[in-house]
């Protein structure tokens, strides 16, 4: 039975962290305190860096979404997804219902059906009628065709049109009727026909124009029927097949009265250049085109008739006018080129300014994250310094414990004559150690202050431009831009000012980028030195803790 158990001696109760901290403070030993009023200046950049970090998912390819099913998308991802809309599901349901209901109606259009682009359907010029003969023109659930027989249409030229005047009916021997000819030739009143024999009916079956009475077919504007041709065609439908010979004999008769009336020229009629001379052909004063017996001096001095020749002055004026026009066109081209170049310069400066601003923002984010990293390194240095102080106290306590735990017969008595000197040496040692600890703390604080000041100076944008400076700067820009301007207007001045200001901003941003780059390099070098010191202090502290642990295990 041991003495401790015999006398019922129990170890003292373990002190709480608060009691231990108060006891260490009474002894003059530094302890860790967490002030509530301390704020980190670059905490926002640390949160920004944490948001940018992507969590590693160890899952096979294609199964990443099942590795962490409870994870919710971040707030930034939700903000960046501009395609999400609360009405997407509603619109999808409505579109699905609309497409389902359209399939049961007759107006449904199958997107996979062939378009009705058959050359044999829906045209009067088709010999197969209006109905499309293609079996692929009908789509899924499309309404049925009324008549799918390609030879049963009402407009079939082989069943309804026989020797009609329509050129597309296939009869090249059909000639226009007198009524159609008169209606076509007398359409423009007061105009003298260029061919006096155009109104005569041709006796040659091959001389008639098979396309004169037919409706004009335009591939882009549809089919425009001719009224006269339709009348003749309708009459030809009613006439029997054997009546064509009588019609041809009647057409051979020449109507001299009508032809003479068409050939008469009204000499009292006023000359209208836009009708008689549509193409700007020069004529003499009498209005005759082919009369070579007229004198060029016949109407000289009467009004201002058109001359049949050009004088030297007219030729010179015309050449000057042409040169002036060419010069004006060249000037206009140069103006357009100048304007286009300035607009391109404005766009280039805008793009460059935007990229410079993005680079500056990225640099500021980088140096801000370096500031947050500096604050974290400062916390590590403070904790490491406190660990060194407490490890030194632990070393003293281990030595004292070893002295108290030795044999009871080993009596240790200090020299009473040196007591004052020992006390003085102990006080000096405590003072020196305390001064050294405070110096280490001040160095750590000074390093953090220098790093923070360096980063804040790099992130400061400087003073903004004042109104007076802007006003005088605008005047200076306009004065300097006059040598690059030609007939400048307000828009031109605005482009010049924008180009100059954008270039000025780009220069300022370039200077700040250089400052950010230099500061970032200095900060990285400083933090590398601090990390090296932390590594060395950590290794030294690890060795000391290991020695104290070994000494405690050797105490029996």
From Swiss-Prot:
GO terms for cellular component: plasma membrane; SNARE complex. Keywords: Coiled coil, Protein transport, Repeat, Transport. Residues 1-20, 64-307 are annotated as: Disordered. Residues 74-104, 113-135, 187-217, 231-248 have a biased composition (Polar residues). It comes from the Eukaryota. GO terms for molecular function: SNAP receptor activity; syntaxin binding. GO terms for biological process: exocytosis; protein transport; vesicle fusion. Residues 151-186 have a biased composition (Low complexity). Residues 339-401, 493-555 form the t-SNARE coiled-coil homology domain. The keyword Transport applies. Residues 249-261 have a biased composition (Basic and acidic residues). The keyword Transport applies. CDD domains: SNARE_SEC9C, SNARE_SEC9N. PANTHER family: SYNAPTOSOMAL ASSOCIATED PROTEIN, SYNAPTOSOMAL-ASSOCIATED PROTEIN 29. Belongs to the SNAP-25 family. This is Protein transport protein SEC9. It comes from Kluyveromyces lactis (strain ATCC 8585 / CBS 2359 / DSM 70799 / NBRC 1267 / NRRL Y-1140 / WM37). The gene is SEC9.
């Amino acid at each position: 039975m041991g003495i401790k158990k015999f006398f019922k001696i129990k170890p003292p109760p373990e002190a709480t962290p608060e009691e231990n901290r108060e006891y260490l403070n009474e002894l003059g030993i530094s302890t860790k305190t967490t002030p509530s009023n301390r704020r980190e200046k670059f905490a926002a950049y640390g949160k920004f860096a944490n948001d940018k970090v992507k969590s590693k998912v160890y899952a096979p390819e294609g199964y990443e979404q099942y590795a962490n099913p409870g994870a919710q998308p971040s707030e930034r991802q939700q903000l960046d997804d501009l395609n999400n809309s609360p009405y997407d599901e509603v619109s999808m349901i409505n579109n699905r219902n609309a497409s389902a209901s359209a399939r049961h109606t007759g107006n449904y259009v199958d997107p996979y059906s062939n378009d009705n682009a058959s050359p044999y359907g829906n045209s009067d010029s088709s010999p197969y009628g209006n109905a499309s003969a293609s079996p692929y023109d009908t789509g899924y659930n499309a309404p049925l065709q009324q008549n799918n027989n390609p030879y049963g249409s009402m407009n079939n030229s082989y069943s309804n049109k026989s020797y009609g005047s329509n050129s597309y009916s296939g009869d090249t021997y059909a000639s226009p009727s007198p009524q159609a000819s008169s209606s076509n030739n007398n359409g423009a009143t007061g105009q003298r026909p260029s061919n006096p024999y155009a109104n005569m009916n041709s006796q040659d079956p091959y001389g008639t124009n098979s396309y004169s009475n037919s409706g004009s077919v335009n591939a882009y504007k549809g089919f425009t029927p001719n009224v006269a041709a339709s009348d003749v065609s309708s009459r030809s439908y009613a006439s029997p097949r054997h009546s064509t010979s009588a019609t041809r004999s009647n057409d051979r008769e020449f109507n001299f009265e009508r032809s003479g009336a068409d050939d008469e020229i009204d000499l009292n009629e006023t000359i209208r250049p836009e009708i008689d001379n549509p193409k700007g052909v020069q004529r003499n004063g009498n209005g005759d085109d082919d009369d070579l017996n007229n004198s060029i001096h016949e109407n000289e001095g009467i009004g201002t008739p058109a001359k049949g020749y050009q004088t030297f002055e007219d030729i010179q004026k015309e050449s000057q006018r042409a040169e002036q026009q060419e010069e004006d066109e060249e000037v206009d081209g140069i103006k357009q080129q100048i304007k286009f170049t300035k607009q391109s310069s404005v766009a280039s400066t805008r793009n460059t300014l935007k990229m410079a601003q993005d680079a500056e923002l990225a640099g500021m984010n980088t140096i801000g994250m370096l500031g947050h990293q500096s604050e974290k390194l400062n916390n590590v240095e403070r904790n490491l310094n406190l660990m060194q102080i407490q490890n030194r106290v632990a070393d003293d306590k281990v030595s004292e414990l070893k002295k108290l735990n030795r044999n009871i017969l080993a009596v240790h008595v200090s020299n009473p004559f040196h007591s004052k000197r020992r006390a003085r040496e102990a006080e000096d040692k405590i003072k020196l150690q305390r001064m050294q600890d405070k110096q280490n703390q001040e160095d750590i604080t000074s390093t953090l202050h220098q790093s923070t000041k360096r980063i804040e100076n790099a992130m400061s944008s400087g003073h903004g431009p004042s109104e007076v400076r802007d006003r005088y700067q605008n005047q200076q820009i306009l004065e300097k831009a006059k040598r690059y301007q030609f007939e400048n207007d307000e828009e031109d001045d605005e482009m010049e000012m924008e180009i100059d200001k954008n270039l000025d901003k780009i220069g300022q941003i370039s200077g700040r980028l250089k400052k950010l780059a230099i500061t970032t390099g200095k900060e990285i070098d400083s933090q590398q030195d601090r990390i090296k010191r932390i590594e060395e202090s950590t290794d030294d502290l690890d060795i000391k803790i290991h020695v104290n642990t070994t000494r405690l295990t050797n105490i029996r």
